[in-house]
Amino acid sequence: MSLRRERTLILALLLILAAASWVMLIWQSSTTNGMGMGMGAALFLAIWVVMMIAMMFPTAAPMMLVFARVQRDRRSGGYAFVPMWVFIGAYLLIWTLFGALVYLGALFAEELAQQVPWIMMNAARIGGGIFVLAGLYQLTPLKRVCLAKCCMPLDFILTSWRDGYPGAFHMGLEHGIYCLGCCWLLFVLLFPLGIMNIAAMALLTALIFVE
């Protein structure tokens, strides 16, 4: 298969996965009361992973394409081939672990809100404060470092390359951490907006993609 056809196929598969995930999220939001904390951890994490595929795969596609390109070139040179799913699996693992922290944090916040009426009375102010924090974080050195790593796929591959299955898994973890460093506070914004708010998710996806 030619390089161009291979790249087109990989990109098409990534976008199909993202599109299918969006369809699932829209269906989920229309058939339930949303992604409330009343659901179990397993269901929450399953929906969370679908969210990450829908929102992050379009942005992460350039990195995955570069990884596949380098793997193809190395295979031609006689090196062992490692499938891209190893890299993607590690990348999604980082977001899944973050989702678990989000779930635990939401349970704690819900319990605290029931015990402290002030929180519910000032929910709008707290939500506004989260927006301010998200805006300020965009200006921090940590944000700039993480964004630089995510915006230069070839540079990341050249400086972070590791051989074999463990190496690809490590690279996926590393790239996932940088992506998380870029976007974690933006995802926290979904709480005041509604975790299953499709319009908010689409807007955040567009912001992340443009960034």
Q: Where in the sequence are the language-model features?
A:
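Histidine-/acidic- and/or cysteine-rich, low-complexity loops and terminal segments associated
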Residues: 1-50, 72-76, 110, 114-119, ...
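Transmembrane alpha-helix/helix-exit interface in multi-pass inner-membrane proteins
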Residues: 96-111, 123-152
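Alpha-helical transmembrane segments
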Residues: 39-56, 120-136
